[in-house]
Amino acid sequence: MDTDKDKIFLDSQERMVKAITSLEKEFTKLRTGRASTSIVDTIKVDYYGTPTPINQLASIAIPDSSSITIQPWDKTAFNPIEKAILKSELGLTPINDGKIIRITLPPLTEDRRKDLVKLARKYGEDTKIAIRNIRRDANEQLKRLEKNKFISEDELKGFTEDIQKMTDNYIKEVETHCKTKEKEIIEI
């Protein structure tokens, strides 16, 4: 029955890693004061009637810390990309010179920075809750194994401690990610 315990442990670890990966993805979407391709990556463009992500229609570059350039591969994509950026709720104003679309990111206001920090903390807290729920699921599965006499009470205690150590490590990782993101947001 070692395989059941191992499966529970590995499954929990895999799910916790996915939770952290999801947090990292959410953090890339949060605008800090620096330009990032992830700010516009998810904007969908109505391209020949099909909603298409910008990164599938153009090259996106970061020439400096406060601007993004978008160079569509197809000349007919300029106007749809520009419209999609204006329609997005990002508050960005694209400048189309016919060869390239430039977006200059306005500096973040103090209030906007505070809102972004709150949002980052919320994402972090949601991830911690997800990790704790994974721990709870693993502990319940281990208790069932013990109840059905597949593992002893001592083994249950040891495996529960292992799951707790893993949980603590991933919670610390979440806290590190949150602190790093908060510093990025607050930096002017």
Swiss-Prot record:
Coiled coil: none annotated. Keywords: Cytoplasm, Protein biosynthesis. InterPro entries: Ribosome_recyc_fac, Ribosome_recyc_fac_dom, RRF_sf. CDD domains: RRF (cd00520). GO terms for cellular component: cytoplasm. It is found in: Cytoplasm. It comes from the Bacteria. SUPFAM superfamilies: Ribosome recycling factor, RRF. GO terms for biological process: translational termination. It holds the Pfam family RRF. The keyword Cytoplasm applies. One of its GO terms (molecular function) is ribosomal large subunit binding. Belongs to the RRF family. HAMAP family: RRF (MF_00040). Responsible for the release of ribosomes from messenger RNA at the termination of protein biosynthesis. May increase the efficiency of translation by recycling ribosomes from one round of translation to another. PANTHER family: MITOCHONDRIAL RIBOSOME RECYCLING FACTOR PSEUDO 1, RIBOSOME RECYCLING FACTOR. This is Ribosome-recycling factor.
